[in-house]
From Swiss-Prot:
Positions of glycan attachment: N221
Protein name: Transmembrane protease serine 3
Statement: the UniProt record of this protein carries the keyword Glycoprotein: yes
Disorder this protein is connected to according to its UniProt record: Deafness, autosomal recessive, 8: A form of non-syndromic sensorineural hearing loss. Sensorineural deafness results from damage to the neural receptors of the inner ear, the nerve pathways to the brain, or the area of the brain that receives sound information.
Length: 454
């Protein structure tokens, strides 16, 4: 009813009106058709009400059972593009069972502290033995991760592996001609152990290096040129809006909330290799494609991750370098001191972005502590992480959205988080909240692999 409509007169309740039977039109078939029609109408509710009720209950039960079947894929793989469930054995088997062939992606990964190569086959992840491994197979593996080339492939003793990486193994089928090895999950066979006692490690890109380091950034320090060479300024119609992280010559990681509703590539430019946003000589790079996570939840900021593809590749130098992605199953302990950077406001409430790049050291905080009722009260999901000080004073702020949270491991800087949200800036019991990159490695690599194939 519209605001200007007269108030409706309340009609006495009847099952006829409830089920729309008052609207039935019955053609007369006898001289006393009007009386017959009236009689039929009076009988319909009583006659059909039990049937209608039973029908509705059956429909509800059918829907519930159907949804239960579709969404409860226990022990199976659920296609993201539909409600279809397939057996795990059908994933990465060379046959596209899901729409758009999604079950034939995410079939290769690099895992653990040692960057061990694993292949998904026969319903589980299995570690690649170095037996029958040839160096040029690394190109195939890296292509399945979305990288156009590789840097190095080495071997590591099985005894040096973390427990989950020495349970199941595969090797390349040595009977296959080299030109037939175009996808690792089509080219391996399962084995109980590695005869050589060694497995394959893989590095697809030279990353995570910088020239030294010297507290966002509220409580932060001004950064030096080349100190955070993967830092990107994402500019919407010429104005800095968010931060990002360079991971390849073509790809930038940022937050989905930065690009949601602002997803036209031509409206964006990227600048890298700079500290000052004012009078800087750094060229602007055009954006070709923007992809944000399909399950991004604006109200809860879940799945807050996006990728930008540049129209042309970056040229790496001392001022521009990619940061490493972490490996699958790689853990970063609570309390580990990591670093966040960006052009965010340096004072809470200041509003404007800082004209110069700042950085701050922030310790990682467990999700258990971050979900305490006095902190974020249970809204932090496993795909998020917190970093900062519960006492306040140092944090990432507006303008740092999408920017990097990096940790150093074995002399390499790794992208552990992308700045997502927080309450205020550097407030007590309100540390910064970041998208946990390890939770989205499969998604990142799938987007890059799909693009590489086009």
């Amino acid at each position: 009813m519209g605001e200007n409509d007269p108030p409706a007169v309340e009609a006495p309740f009847s099952f006829r009106s409830l089920f729309g039977l008052d609207d039935l039109k019955i053609s007369p078939v006898a001289p006393d058709a009007d009386a017959v029609a009236a009689q039929i109408l009076s009988l319909l509710p009583l006659k059909f009400f039990p049937i209608i009720v039973i029908g509705i209950i059956a429909l509800i039960l059918a829907l519930a059972i159907g949804l239960g079947i579709h969404f409860d894929c226990s022990g199976k793989y659920r296609c993201r593009s539909s409600f279809k469930c397939i057996e795990l054995i059908a994933r990465c088997d060379g046959v596209s069972d899901c729409k758009d062939g999604e079950d034939e992606y995410r079939c290769v990964r690099v895992g653990g502290q040692n960057a061990v190569l694993q292949v998904f086959t026969a319903a589980s992840w299995k570690t690649m033995c170095s037996d029958d491994w040839k160096g040029h197979y690394a190109n195939v593996a890296c292509a399945q991760l979305g990288f156009p080339s590789y840097v190095s492939s080495d071997n590591l003793r099985v005894s040096s592996l973390e427990g989950q990486f020495r349970e199941e193994f595969v090797s390349i089928d040595h009977l296959l001609p080299d030109d037939k090895v175009t996808a690792l999950h089509h080219s391996v066979y399962v084995r109980e152990g590695c005869a050589s006692g060694h497995v394959v490690t893989l590095q697809c890109t030279a990353c995570g290096h910088r020239r030294g380091y010297s507290s966002r950034i509220v409580g932060g320090n001004m950064s030096l040129l080349s100190q955070w060479p993967w830092q990107a300024s994402l500019q919407f119609q010429g104005y800095h809006l968010c931060g990002g992280s360079v991971i390849t010559p073509l790809w930038i990681i940022t937050a989905a909330h930065c690009v949601y509703d602002l997803y036209l590539p031509k409206s964006w430019t990227i600048q890298v290799g700079l500290v000052s946003l004012l009078d800087n000589p750094a060229p602007s790079h055009l954006v070709e494609k923007i992809v944000y996570h399909s399950k991004y939840k604006p109200k809860r900021l879940g799945n807050d991750i996006a990728l930008m593809k540049l129209a042309g590749p970056l040229t790496f130098n001392e001022m521009i370098q990619p940061v490493c992605l972490p490996n699958s199953e790689e853990n970063f302990p609570d309390g580990k001191v990591c670093w966040t950077s960006g052009w965010g406001a340096t004072e809470d409430g200041a509003g404007d972005a800082s004209p110069v790049l700042n950085h701050a050291a922030v310790p990682l905080i467990s999700n258990k502590i971050c979900n305490h009722r006095d902190v974020y009260g249970g809204i932090i999901s496993p795909s998020m992480l917190c970093a900062g000080y519960l006492t306040g004073g140092v944090d990432s702020c507006q303008g740092d959205s999408g920017g990097p949270l990096v940790c150093q491991e074995r002399r390499l800087w790794k992208l552990v988080g992308a700045t997502s949200f927080g309450i205020g800036c550097a407030e007590v019991n309100k540390p910064g909240v970041y998208t946990r990159v390890t939770s989205f490695l499969d998604w990142i690599h799938e987007q890059m692999e799909r693009d590489l194939k086009t």
